[in-house]
Amino acid sequence: MLRFLFLLFVSFSGMAASESDLWEKIKQASLASQNLCYSGILNTVDEKQDISSTRMIHVNHKNEEFLKIEKIDGAPNLLLMHQTDAVLYDNDHDKILIKRKKNARLFPNIFPTSVEKLKENYSIFDGGPFRVANRPSTMFVLSPKDQYRFNYHLWLDDESSLPLKLMVIDNNQKIIENISFANLEFLSNEDVSWFRPNLDPQKKYIINEENQLSQSVRKFWSIEQLPQGFEEMSYSAKRYSGLNAIAHQIVFTDGLSFISVFIHPVPKNQKPQTGSTRMGSNNIHAQYKQGYQIMAVGAVPMTTLSSLTDNVKLSNE
């Protein structure tokens, strides 16, 4: 608790710098995370205070981003990312599942293209000097202007503006996300020869391709009112294998926070999920309407999720 009071105190004590100057620092951080070449060890602390470590390397080669993240602890999972398209190699005993994901955004590249949208939903404060990964840094606090999102604490490298640490703090002053560089090295060249998986001939590789459907799939639902500051980022639909049923996923964002809404039919012999729970850094809220499961997931307050599921209207309602 004393730590949080201290963070709160330094957040407001650093207000001498103008707000426009502070937002300019965030712009510089966004550019640094995309344009610089760097590598290092990232530590992630979960809600049980367990630490998991990954090794990452990021290179901007001819204005294109290449990223590789390898797990150091546990199964040697691997993520390769080109621009915003990611491929995950997930070790599963005697086989490796290959999963694809579009529009991925991973630390330290966590900012939207324009920070103008962030200004609408967050106030910004200077949290003062710190030291992260043995480098001088400055903490910035992004505090929500309403009840629909959480607090973000960011530590930016003084020399390069690269984000070195991120903490997401909920309304109960609990840290729900905590990731930081343990060490950091800036690279002097744009070599991308490392951008490939190390294939294991002893294992079977399975591409987990979901049967994605086109945007022309008829939407039988609508969301009448979004929480303040959120807008649709992406939409996808897939058909269940062997079933004449379609599952929908819509992703919403305010620039920092993300919410996924899943809408899918519930078989007659299956009990739908309803109510609220928490899994890791994400809150989950589920409702059941007219034979369909509606579930919202995100690192945002539960009221934000419930406002979304409440406003999903099916065409037969």
Model-derived regions: residue spans:
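A short, surface-exposed beta-strand/turn
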Residues: 60-61, 80, 153-165, 266-270
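Intrinsically disordered, low-complexity linker/loop segments enriched in Gly/Pro
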Residues: 103-152
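Short, solvent-exposed recognition patches
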Residues: 204-289, 303
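An acidic-aromatic
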Residues: 56-109, 168-180
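Sec-dependent signal peptide recognition
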Residues: 1-7
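Short, hydrophobic/aromatic-rich segments at coil-to-beta transitions
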Residues: 35-39, 62-68, 134-141, 162-165, ...
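N-terminal leader/targeting segments and the immediate start of mature chains
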Residues: 8, 12-64, 101, 129, ...
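Gly/Pro-enriched, hydrophobic low-complexity segments
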Residues: 133-201
